[in-house]
Amino acid sequence: MAYYRTPHDVTALPAWQALQKHRDAMQSFSMREAFAADAKRFDQFSLSACGLFLDYSKNLITEQSRDLLVNLANEVGLQDAIKSMFSGEIINASEGRPVLHTALRRPVGDKLSVNGVNVMPEVHKVLNQITELVGRIHDGLWRGYSEKPITDVVNIGIGGSFLGPELVSEALLPYAQRGVRCHYLANIDGSEFHELSANLRAETTLFIVSSKSFNTLETLKNAMAARTWYLAQGGSEAELYRHFIAVSSNKAAAVAFGIREENIFPMWDWVGGRYSLWSAIGLPIALAIGTANFKELLSGAYTMDQHFQTAPFDKNMPVLLALLGVWYGNFWDANSHAILPYDHYLRNITKHLQQLDMESNGKSVLQDGTPVKTDTGPVIWGGVGCNGQHAYHQLLHQGTQLIPADFIVPVVSFNPVADHHQWLYANCLSQSQALMLGKTREEAEAELRAKGLNEADIEKLAPHKVIPGNRPSNTLVVERISPRRLGALVAMYEHKVFVQSVIWGINAFDQWGVELGKELGKGVYQRLVGSLEDSAEDGSTQGLINYFRGRHRG
């Protein structure tokens, strides 16, 4: 039976139990000693794929560790699970849906049936729609109510309708097309809309309302605010269609808002929000970098899809990263994972990966609804490299928790300034090196002695300068950030998350936990504005409602 119909108890598998024994044997393993003993360790634990280079040699593993982890992947039926996803089986069991974001990057001529219908012609029809719209806007043919060309595009969306597109359009800023600026409006906080609209002119602004249901609270409220602002700035209801388009599966609601049907781009229920940047949700990406570059992004992701499906697990980049995550989360008690990009343009990748990983694998039941017997998804956190060194890297080096990290760095900068990039790259490498090597008591004492400190002061200060080392990390190197390589990088992390969900036996493609807060929020709002008089379900919430009502004016 397919893994999503009869999930396994992973802790009962022979491979899992073998890993538990191996973990005990690895208690005294030292990466420092492993590198000293094996000149080929770097070569044995590194690989290239799809324009990415992965060094995973600075991990608490041996070749036996890798073999045992690959055995685990085989025992959970990972190869069949991969085939199930790519062929359109209903692996999102709780919602009864296939999972086919990978179809969005498949080339023309491919066939893929969902419920007996080949979906690929529709996928490429939408891609052609995107190409046509982007061309009109870039050529100055799409004009606002005053007949001036569009200069600014505002994407109104939240979650997956925002994080992925923002990541890509900012990561590929060096590829930005002249004449059109892209902005993002996500939060329901009025200050965000105020700050954004202050720098826009209604007559040359196009809003994209991105919401599958056309009913997402934050998105709908911001769309209404944009509509009100547009009218107040001199726009008319009759010309509204020039300034609002939509990406939604709810055509009726979008048309009722004032958007013309031909300006509504479809969404499919087999593409989840956090996997949707490859769809029409990526329209702001195409507007920012042009459709040729957008198609390169898709092509890069497709190459990673091919690698994921065909490479042996011990040479498969997403699989190896997933297995290392399981190794640390389930056998070394790691509760979080740091993402550390050493590139200004990649500064938003951590936010995207937070949603991708935590919304996917933040689950506590198996696919059949029974409780899991082991920890699942970790906390994902981090930020831009050098800034982090002067903030939270201290915890990575000398804290009590084991926190694996991914360093991401390009070889070539788009904007070289003197020797800045050489220092940036050096900082990235030295941080991963310091995490691995650490500093022994003897080294700390020798360092202080060389500075001329007396023995009494050395005795006091040396313990504070000891750094445990043996902290694991991966280093992902790209020659230069490009649409193709970025597509491969994001797809790699998508597949990593999926692999971990298969191992744990959970559903990576639903997000029921998000819904409860939305439901309760309606009641809280009604009590805040006085339209509901009964008390909240608990005293804390009611107390905070009372505090607001006693002080808010307006």
UniProtKB/Swiss-Prot annotation:
It is found in: Cytoplasm. It comes from the Bacteria. Gene3D superfamilies: 1.10.1390.10, Glucose-6-phosphate isomerase like protein, domain 1. PROSITE patterns: P_GLUCOSE_ISOMERASE_1, P_GLUCOSE_ISOMERASE_2, P_GLUCOSE_ISOMERASE_3. One of its GO terms (cellular component) is cytosol. The active site is at E359, H390, K518. Belongs to the GPI family. This is Glucose-6-phosphate isomerase 2. One of its GO terms (biological process) is glycolytic process. The keyword Isomerase applies. It catalyses: alpha-D-glucose 6-phosphate = beta-D-fructose 6-phosphate. It comes from Pseudomonas putida (strain ATCC 47054 / DSM 6125 / CFBP 8728 / NCIMB 11950 / KT2440). GO terms for molecular function: carbohydrate derivative binding; glucose-6-phosphate isomerase activity; monosaccharide binding. Catalyzes the reversible isomerization of glucose-6-phosphate to fructose-6-phosphate.
